[in-house]
């Protein structure tokens, strides 16, 4: 049995993860970490420093500002940390990269199987289409999401950029009077209602448009992905920065 400590256990995703964990025979949430605790089937600690029990994997699905406290705990325990939060700064990402040299860390901007398959497809199709097609990314989320563009949109955009040999640049939204440049990758964010998460990658050519689309129907898809990452990381002891590609066996 893999024992999980869930940071952000009382948030929207934390509640869904707690519910979905009961479907995994080899996983158990033994404790949670949350500043605003409510009654659960497991004990809740307000900060990582307060945690006083043993665990196998630390799962974070909260906010980016929790990162340093979680890394400090991981440095003490040497247990794997699964990072599912988004909205990290470049400094945060550099810190994760640095700590992964000595700690087993996992990070993904999106925990769904579908998004990660699309990301894998982009590595293959982008070099074939770029040059004859303009590339734009549109992401849609609920009106409570604080980071923009979404971590997933950034993930997809980075994959596209890394797949192109030429110099490209990101353009976030469009306004005013200016013609689109050939080397642009457009990224657009929409916030409204209760949209769980929609992502469209558009390759617009002359006479045709190719789209890769993903629509999350419920948060359960992210919860299951996070728990599968815990299954995988529960078997890992070597330092490194692991991703969903490792979990689902995608080779780059």
UniProtKB/Swiss-Prot annotation:
Principal subcellular localisation of the protein: cytoplasm
PROSITE patterns per the UniProt record, alphabetical: DAPB
GO molecular-function terms, A-Z: 4-hydroxy-tetrahydrodipicolinate reductase; NAD binding; NADP binding; oxidoreductase activity, acting on CH or CH2 groups, NAD or NADP as acceptor
Pathway: Amino-acid biosynthesis; L-lysine biosynthesis via DAP pathway; (S)-tetrahydrodipicolinate from L-aspartate: step 4/4
Location(s), subcellular: Cytoplasm
GO cellular component: cytosol
Class in the EC hierarchy, top level: oxidoreductase
Active site: 141, 145
BP terms from Gene Ontology: diaminopimelate biosynthetic process; lysine biosynthetic process via diaminopimelate
Organism: Clostridium botulinum (strain Alaska E43 / Type E3)
SUPFAM superfamilies per UniProt: Glyceraldehyde-3-phosphate dehydrogenase-like, C-terminal domain (SSF55347), NAD(P)-binding Rossmann-fold domains (SSF51735)
Binding positions (NAD(+)): 8-13, 84-86, 108-111
Database matches in PANTHER family: 4-HYDROXY-TETRAHYDRODIPICOLINATE REDUCTASE, DIHYDRODIPICOLINATE REDUCTASE
Name of the protein: 4-hydroxy-tetrahydrodipicolinate reductase
Family classification: Belongs to the DapB family.
Described purpose of this protein according to its UniProt entry: Catalyzes the conversion of 4-hydroxy-tetrahydrodipicolinate (HTPA) to tetrahydrodipicolinate.
EC number: 1.17.1.8
Intrachain S-S bonds: none
InterPro entries reported in the protein's UniProt record: DapB_C (IPR022663), DapB_N (IPR000846), DapB_N_CS (IPR022664), DHDPR_bac (IPR023940), NAD(P)-bd_dom_sf (IPR036291)
Positions bound to (S)-2,3,4,5-tetrahydrodipicolinate: 142, 151-152
Catalytic activity: (S)-2,3,4,5-tetrahydrodipicolinate + NAD(+) + H2O = (2S,4S)-4-hydroxy-2,3,4,5-tetrahydrodipicolinate + NADH + H(+); (S)-2,3,4,5-tetrahydrodipicolinate + NADP(+) + H2O = (2S,4S)-4-hydroxy-2,3,4,5-tetrahydrodipicolinate + NADPH + H(+)
Keywords, alphabetical: Amino-acid biosynthesis, Cytoplasm, Diaminopimelate biosynthesis, Lysine biosynthesis, NAD, NADP, Oxidoreductase
Gene3D superfamilies, sorted: Dihydrodipicolinate Reductase, domain 2, NAD(P)-binding Rossmann-like Domain
